[in-house]
Amino acid sequence: MNHAPHLYFAWQQLVEKSQLMLRLATEEQWDELIASEMAYVNAVQEIAHLTEEIDPSTTMQEQLRPMLRLILDNESKVKQLLQIRMDELAKLVGQSSVQKSVLSAYGDQGGFVLAPQDNLS
């Protein structure tokens, strides 16, 4: 049984999933990106399985090379966008931690409002 057409189709599907993930990351649709990750991983596993079953010819490897290049480029761009997002989240967590420390240090004043007073008498 010739699995070569199926392998080529699986690569095409992986390219589509890769492009979807890049679009979602570019549009900052993080929840959707995470949800699409499993389909991407499954597609990669299917390609690995099919590649083990057949030995792709040199011609087929040449046909697949541009798809692999595109997938790797997309993956690199998605990783860059994710790193930017992680940096943003780390900054927000840091700000939240500072706010919590300030509230903890100054917020528990027994219900009294501390304000400067005029004691010039």
UniProtKB/Swiss-Prot annotation:
Keyword line: Bacterial flagellum biogenesis, Chaperone, Cytoplasm, Repressor, Transcription, Transcription regulation
Location of this chain's protein in the cell: Cytoplasm, Cytosol
Cysteines joined through disulfide linkages: none
Pfam families, alphabetized: FliT
UniProt KW Isomerase keyword: no
InterPro entries: FliT
UniProt keyword Cytoplasm present: yes
Annotated segments matching region Required for homodimerization: 1-50
GO biological process, one term: bacterial-type flagellum organization
GO CC terms, sorted: cytosol
Chief location category: cytoplasm
Family of the protein in this entry: Belongs to the FliT family.
Subunit note: Homodimer. Interacts with FliD and FlhC.
Function in brief: Dual-function protein that regulates the transcription of class 2 flagellar operons and that also acts as an export chaperone for the filament-capping protein FliD. As a transcriptional regulator, acts as an anti-FlhDC factor; it directly binds FlhC, thus inhibiting the binding of the FlhC/FlhD complex to class 2 promoters, resulting in decreased expression of class 2 flagellar operons. As a chaperone, effects FliD transition to the membrane by preventing its premature polymerization, and by directing it to the export apparatus.
Name this protein carries in UniProt: Flagellar protein FliT
Species, as recorded: Escherichia coli (strain SMS-3-5 / SECEC)
